[in-house]
Structures are given as C-alpha cells and as structure tokens.
Amino acid sequence: MKRPLSALLAMLIPVCAAAKEAPSTVHPWTPPGVSSDLFESHPAFDPRTGDLYFVRSSKEFKGWRILTSHCDGRQWSTPVDTPFAAPGAEADPWFTPDGRSIYFISTRATGRQNSKDLDIWRADRNADGSWQKPVRLPEPVNSGEAEWFPRMAPDGWLYFGSNRAGGLGKNDIWRAKETRPGQWTVENAGPAINTAGDEYEPLPSPDGKRLIVMADGGLYQSHWDGHRWTKKEKLGPEVNVNGSEIGAAFSPSGKSLLFARDTGEPESGEFFVWQPQGAEAWPPMCGQAKTSGAARRK
C-alpha cells in the first residue's frame, strides 16, 4: 500500500534531523604549550609522570625531534628535548605500560657517524626514575633499511614498520619477539595487514585484540580472531579526512585514539582524539582544561 507523500515526509524529517544532531566522535586536542604552527604528531604519555612525549617537525614533516612537556598545574610547559636526546632524526616514542622503558626510532650515531637509516632504540629507567643510555635493538629487528613506530603488544610481540627486503609491498608491518635474552625472531605480519602498497605504523590495542595500521589513505583497523589478524579495514571518514592521519596512540582503556592530521596552513599538523564509545577523561587535562575541557585553537 502506498503512503501519501506528506506522511512519508513527516516520517523522514525527524530521522534526518536526528542524524544531523548526532555528536561528533572526533575532536581537536590542541592544548596551549603543545600546539604550535609546526607539525605535532606521535604522542605518548609517560605512565609514571604523566609527561607528554611527542614529535615536532617542520610544516613539511621534516626534521623530526622528540620533545617532552610537563603539566605544571596551569598548562603544559614549553616542550624541551628528552633527557636521552642525541643528534639526528628521532621520532615515534612509545612507553611500556609500566613506564620502565621507552622505545623510539633514531638516526643517532652507533659509532663515529650517524646511522644512514632509522633504527629502533630502547631506553630503560633507573630506580630513581632517570633514564639509562639508550640501546639499539639488534639484528634482525633492525636491518640495513629503515624501521619505525615500534609498539609492543601484550603478548610480547614488538610490531614495527620497515621497508626491508622480503615484504609484500613497498613498506610493510613486521613483528619481532625476544625468544631469549638478546635473541629475536622476526616475521612479516602477513597479507591481512600488508599489501603491495605502503603500510607504515602498527598500533596494538592495550588488550591485544585490535591493531590500528597507518597505511595508504590513513588509518585502518584489524581484529585478532584468536588465531590471526583479520583483513584490515579503513576507519570511517570522520577519522580519515584527508589520508594524512598518522601517529596514533590508544588511551589506557583502549576506548580513545589520539592521532595527528595535516590540517594545512596555518596550523600544519595537529592532534585529534577519536572517542567512538563516548567521552572519557583522556587525553589528560591540564590547568584550565580541567574545568573547561581540552583547549582548542580558535
């Protein structure tokens, strides 16, 4: 039976209005002291101190340096080099959940000269909280090509990106596991994750059941089915606005995702937080943001 046009319109208008009013799940996170007219990306919060570590580079995403900022009770402090900084490119910081170690990539010197490519390094904490001298992970984790974005899953597999030989495409996701002290096994993450194109950055969720992958076109997600990773699927248009989305970090609960996006002039790279399950008190608030919400550039 056909309905009168007026009746159909009466039914559709409230539905359309509700869709327009649906709250956004992605919001800018641009706190004063951290946000600048340069490119901020790859955030990591120190589980022990709450300090923010992140990468700042030129507007063209060159000259990567890891900086750190502390909440002084009023706002995030002016970012400075990390205590373990060295000459060269440094990026992609990631803390172990207990805060005892930090992984990152660097072209710092292993002898008299800087490395010709990016390698994975780890720094461990002393009992007093200070950082020990960083150590370069051995082969076969590092190779003669570039490695980036090292992230440890709860099961002990260290996921990372690399353009080394033997992959399925130009750049692939790999994973490594330390089978005994100093001895590592490395394997490709497989065709569900990698393609003939580019996959750069892997991020296992805190519970190990999801894997966020930065690849051609932005951010993707895969699920662990108990035996293997499912074929990755691209996240929706609210997250992937222009395909420049990179450097993701999960909240401790796994409910929120902080990432960077190239917004163009004048801001360049900025942080955004995706909260598909609703708001939670993360990223950590500082100063006035504790009462007024995360500060945003106007």
Regions found by a protein language model. Give the residues of each.
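Positively charged n-region of N-terminal signal peptides that target proteins for export
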Residues: 1-4
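Bacterial N-terminal signal peptides
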Residues: 6-15
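Short, conserved micro-motifs composed of acidic
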Residues: 19-298
